[in-house]
A protein has these predicted regions:
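Intrinsic-disorder/low-complexity signal
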Residues: 1-732
């Protein structure tokens, strides 16, 4: 059974704070304030601090209750540090001992460590200690506010009813961890009863967890199954398969009651389009559902399954569309046909425009689209605006829908559209979108954006499924500033089951690519040192071991830039071929250091931290602009042919392509999206009057007047929360 401490772990990870301990009962003594202060100081060592409301609530609790809450919170905060503290890199006094060694010694040490299956290390001075970390230039500590017990349900409802598929980690958290608990699911169903679920993938995952309950038909989402593809996704979810349908699902054997429920849902949907689009998948599903057993009840189901099994061609809207898209294209007829399905029009707007013979035809096509675009899903309009904003960028990446799908640079061979046309299309859709988002407002709403969040540099995640879980989860192309410090330390930790043969254990590699206009250098296991860049690798761990393994790469920002390298890309590669999702625990990131003080892993200096959980064996984390001192999120796996010796050198071209793609993006920012949703941006003096505040520092916005309602505060890194602000109907 889940406890409040389990809920706190989730709300803490999503920037929503924790539920504080209950106040001491009358006659019971509250904890002494000095204990709470000491606990808060301990948190600061790891880059966190209690917000005022949480601190005050802890001071009112009994000692034992406070200690339980504090211990659970401390476990969350110190999880990474505890994992890494059990191990050391190959060079125990890194970076000093490794930097003093010559290149031959570095190679020999790596080799000897490999021969001993990770046991042997070079001699080191056990009495040597690191000077205490200089805390004068650390990143701002992350505040932990108090939240109520309802917050975990708000998070779950916002995640499920959001307008976008959840990332694998978010989906696992909601549907596997939380909804695995019977009591939690019952409470959640009560709150979800009147809610509709616009995203069909989330609908399939949610219903698959509750379909065995007799009361599930009382849920409003029961009426959200509109097409046969929706039911196909549900069958995939019930079989623990990919609901994106990027891979053909393998259906399990369904119980008789489940077969009847699936067929009943299917009977009342539009079937032709889905069956024509996924014929093989429906053949396999039919083999599990046995529609012939229910032919007297679900006649339409039986007829369509019979057609698909016998190879009968099904005439659909799409079949007519395919005919109209054949060369030569009549843009007028095509756009007229597309108006019948606005969503399809959005998907094919670019095709229709580039096949127009003159500007007047373009005007007609665009006019027709604008006339129907208000009925299109808002998130699709966001993606369409981003498409036309970035259409003429030099580098384009194609990414699959599957978990961990690799991205590949495209050589585009399509008819051009002028930049003026692209800007015009994006602007016209933008003007329609803000009207859609504000359509149900009875009065203008206002928002205050904390300038320290730099929301104008944070890309709005139009596809959260592709966003890796992180301390500050951000979409590809988002930019944040580096704090003071001249040395960057990339880090990688992993722990997994090596198997009986440590010679062939799990081998992950941390690498850094330095590149400028016409040159590149690499610091990785085969080139562990470059003195001109002040760069040093901590050694190549070749297996996980019983406690995990760690690798670091240090480099000097000034030296890199002075030697003509403007960018540094941080990458992780599974050399042994295991996917990140197969690890027991794996994460990577970057710290900002002064090069003189602190332990090897100092949580308070962590700038970005990414969880390695996807079905991928490679990740480009971030690229750092050494001139502007900006960290640009890349968060892409790059596609490349499989090589036994594949490394950062062989992947240089796709890595740089992924970084270039991220840096050139002109997609909608979080600030632009908030501007569409809210009629007024408030100035700093007026934040108390805001409908909502977007900030990662809730302590700055505390209302002292008890009669004044406190504005809702949402972190820009809380993706379900941001989606609810912009697309939700209850976002005051």
């Amino acid at each position: 059974m889940l406890t409040v401490y389990d809920f706190n772990r989730i709300t803490f990870a999503h920037h929503r704070g924790i539920v504080p301990p209950m106040p001491a009962q009358e006659g019971k003594k509250a904890v002494e304030k000095r204990y709470v202060c000491s606990a808060n100081m301990k948190l600061m060592e790891y880059g966190y601090i209690m917000a005022r409301d949480l601190f005050d609530a802890c001071c009112k609790a009994e000692y034992n209750d406070f200690l339980k809450t504090w211990s659970a919170l401390y476990d969350c905060v110190t999880e990474d540090g505890k994992a890494i503290s059990q191990i050391s890199p190959i060079w125990p006094n890194f970076p000093d001992d490794a930097m003093k060694a010559d290149l031959v010694d570095l190679y020999v040490v790596n080799f000897l460590n490999y021969l001993t299956c990770g046991e042997w290390q070079p001699d080191f001075d056990p009495t040597k200690f690191c000077p205490a970390l200089d805390r004068s230039h650390l990143p701002a500590v992350k505040q932990i506010p108090a939240c109520d017990e309802e917050e975990i349900y708000r998070y779950s409802v916002q995640s499920i009813t959001g307008h976008s598929p959840l990332s694998p980690d978010e989906a696992s958290c909601v549907f596997d961890t939380l909804m695995h608990d019977i009591d939690f699911t019952s409470e959640l169903m009560d709150r979800m009863k009147p809610k509709h679920i616009p995203c069909k993938e989330n609908l399939a995952l949610y219903v698959s967890r509750i379909i065995s309950r007799p009361e599930w038909r009382e849920q409003a989402c029961f009426r959200d199954f509109k097409s046969s593809t929706d039911v196909l996704r549900l069958a995939a979810a019930m079989s623990d398969q990919d609901v994106s349908l990027s891979k053909a699902p393998k259906f399990r054997n369904f119980k008789r009651g489940e077969r009847r429920q699936l067929l009943e849902l299917l009977e009342h949907t539009d079937k032709n389009e889905g069956f024509a689009l996924h014929p093989e998948e429906f053949k396999r599903l039919g083999e599990r559902l046995h529609p012939g057993d229910y032919s007297y009840i679900f006649k339409e189901d039986y007829e369509i399954f019979t057609k698909i099994r016998n190879g009968v061609k099904i005439e659909t809207y799409n079949s007519k569309l395919q005919e109209l898209m054949k060369k030569p294209v009549n843009a007028e007829l095509l756009s007229a046909h597309l108006m019948m399905r606005p969503g399809m029009f959005a998907r094919n707007l670019d095709f229709a425009l580039r096949n127009c013979s003159n500007e007047q035809q373009m005007e007609n096509v665009l006019f027709r689209f604008i006339s129907v675009c208000k009925s299109i899903e808002p998130r699709v309009l966001v993606q369409l605006i981003n498409h036309f904003r970035n259409r003429n960028n030099p580098v384009h990446l194609a990414s699959g829908k599957a978990n961990g799908a690799a991205s590949k640079a495209l050589e585009r061979d399509i008819e051009p559209l002028s930049e003026d046309i692209c800007k015009r299309v994006a602007r016209d859709i933008f003007n329609q979108l803000w009207q859609v988002l504000r359509a149900e407002d009875t009065e203008p709403k206002s928002v205050y954006i904390d300038p320290d969040c730099h929301c104008n540099k944070l890309i709005f995640p139009d596809n959260p499924r592709q966003v890796t879980s992180a301390v500050r989860a951000a979409a590809c192309g988002s930019r944040t500033n580096l704090p003071d410090g001249n040395v960057l330390r990339a880090f990688l930790y992993w722990k997994g089951n090596d198997g009986p043969d440590l010679w062939n254990g799990i081998d992950l590699d941390l690498s850094v690519v330095f590149y400028g206009e016409e040159k590149a250098k690499f610091v990785y296991y085969a080139n562990p040192k470059d003195e001109t860049l002040g760069a040093i690798h901590s050694g190549d761990r070749r297996c996980s071991g019983k406690n995990g393994a760690v690798e670091y790469v240090d480099f000097d920002i000034k030296k890199c830039f002075q030697n003509g390298f403007r960018y540094a890309a941080l990458t992780v590669k599974s050399y042994s071929g295991e996917k990140f999702s197969e690890m027991e625990n794996a994460f990577c990131g970057v710290m900002v250091r002064d090069g003189k003080t602190g332990e090897q892993f100092e949580p308070a200096t962590v700038k970005d931290r990414f969880a390695l959980t996807t079905d991928s064996d490679q990740l480009v984390m971030v690229v750092i602009d050494l001139m502007t001192r900006e960290v640009i999120t890349v968060d892409k796996s790059v596609a490349q042919f499989r090589l036994a010796c594949r490394n950062v050198v062989t992947d240089y071209a796709p890595t740089v392509a992924a970084c270039t793609y991220a840096m050139q993006l002109k997609s909608l920012s979080i600030k632009e999206m908030l501007g569409m949703r809210y009629a007024q941006f408030l100035k700093s003096d007026d934040w108390k009057h805001a409908s909502v505040i977007v900030s990662d520092e809730p302590e700055k916005f505390k209302v002292t007047d008890k009669d004044t309602p406190a504005p809702r505060i949402v972190s820009p890194y809380d993706i379900p929360g941001i989606y609810d602000l912009i697309f939700g109907k209850e976002n005051q």
